[in-house]
């Protein structure tokens, strides 16, 4: 019998049933009506939405209508810096950049070195903060300007955040956070207070602009508990409720529901060299048959194949992706050839990304919010 899946902000285990998870969290599926609203205002729909990577939301229709009224809004997401960045981490950031470009929006990006320090018994605070700076390079490398991107490294940029977090904390009871996050008597008080900080960023643009400025938060579905609480207390604090857009997890190269830092071969990291990328891709699990002869005769199953999943991520051309799907199903495309095509796409992306990443080194402070506010 298959183990029941587990999804929390700190752990994802088992084969995730996304529809069941949606019902459990109480978020709404992203329908063609919301997608049509986005297309109306953006002029197009990003492939990550079109292809179903982002599949659920809270009040996405509200933020689109708010935009239609010409009112201000902003973007928010984040990263827990527990180690190097892999491609799965970057999926919400890529969509974030697209929204920023399409709608001319400022981006608030929280890097939670404090949370990772609290959560990992072996993690030193200095190590978490060093990873925060390293991970920030991957965010900047997506092409954000310092005018648009506001980085918040929690231990370095707490000043504008803390007064809001204090007000948030006063509205959250122990019973509420215990029930929401599964905290126990052995949970350290850092983790218990931490949700106040992640929620606070959702209200920060309103404070800074001194007018109602709701945020749209593209993130993985496991972050929903934080923003459910944010929405529950927003009215009482006089802030607009944040809207959210939730993604599925990026399938592991090994075939599991989610990439895992505990198994480096399950993911492609931005710092992986070409040889490592090639090895990981060529060794990846597939939806193909055991032999080339059977593949040609019966075809493969792209829907369970991480290699096809990655083609959907890296190929912007719908016709090209559909051809790979059909050629796999018909047996015209063998797994080895499909993997080589993917390796080429990933190598090109990472080469360009790493060049931009190195150019960003030494410039992180130009993007930090507290540095900008102190000038």
From Swiss-Prot:
The organism of origin for this protein: Pyrobaculum aerophilum (strain ATCC 51768 / DSM 7523 / JCM 9630 / CIP 104966 / NBRC 100827 / IM2)
Reaction catalysed by this enzyme: tRNA(Trp) + L-tryptophan + ATP = L-tryptophyl-tRNA(Trp) + AMP + diphosphate + H(+)
Pfam family, one: tRNA-synt_1b
Record's protein name: Tryptophan--tRNA ligase
Record-stated family: Belongs to the class-I aminoacyl-tRNA synthetase family.
NCBIfam families recorded: PRK12285.1-4, trpS
Motif ('KMSKS' region): 258-262
GO cellular component: cytoplasm
């Amino acid at each position: 019998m298959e183990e029941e899946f587990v999804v929390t902000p700190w752990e994802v285990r088992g084969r995730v049933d996304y529809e069941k998870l949606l019902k459990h969290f109480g978020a709404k599926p992203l329908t063609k009506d919301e997608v049509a609203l986005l297309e109306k205002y953006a002029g197009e729909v990003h492939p990550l939405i079109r292809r179903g990577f982002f599949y659920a939301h809270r009040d996405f229709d509200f933020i689109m209508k708010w935009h239609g009224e010409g009112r201000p809004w902003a973007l928010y997401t984040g990263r827990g810096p527990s180690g190097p960045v892999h491609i799965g981490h970057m999926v919400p950031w890529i969509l974030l950049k697209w929204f920023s470009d399409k709608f001319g929006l400022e981006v608030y990006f929280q890097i939670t070195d404090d949370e990772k320090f609290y959560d990992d018994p072996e993690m030193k605070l200095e190590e978490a903060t060093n990873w925060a700076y390293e991970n920030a390079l991957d965010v900047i490398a997506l092409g954000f300007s310092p005018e648009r991107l506001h980085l918040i490294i929690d231990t370095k940029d707490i000043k504008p955040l803390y007064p809001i977090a204090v007000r948030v904390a006063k509205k959250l009871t122990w019973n509420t956070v215990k029930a929401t996050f599964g905290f126990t008597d052995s949970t350290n008080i850092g983790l218990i207070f931490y949700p106040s900080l992640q929620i606070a960023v959702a209200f920060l643009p309103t404070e800074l602009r001194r007018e109602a400025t709701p945020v749209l938060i593209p993130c993985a579905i496991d972050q929903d508990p934080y923003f459910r609480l944010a929405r529950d207390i927003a009215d009482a604090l006089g802030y607009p409720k944040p809207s959210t857009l939730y993604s599925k997890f990026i399938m592991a190269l090994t075939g599991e529901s989610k990439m895992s830092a505990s198994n480096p071969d399950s993911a492609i990291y931005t710092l992986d060299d070409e040889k490592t990328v090639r090895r990981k891709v060529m060794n990846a699990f597939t939806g193909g048959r055991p032999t080339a002869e059977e593949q040609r005769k019966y075809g493969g199953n792209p829907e369970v194949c991480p290699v096809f999943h990655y083609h959907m991520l890296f190929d912007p051309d719908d016709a090209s992706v559909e051809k790979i799907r059909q050629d796999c199903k018909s047996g015209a495309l063998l797994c080895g050839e499909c993997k080589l095509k993917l390796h080429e796409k990933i190598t090109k992306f990472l080469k360009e990304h790493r060049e931009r990443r190195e150019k960003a080194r030494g410039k992180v402070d130009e993007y930090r919010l507290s540095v900008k506010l102190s000038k």
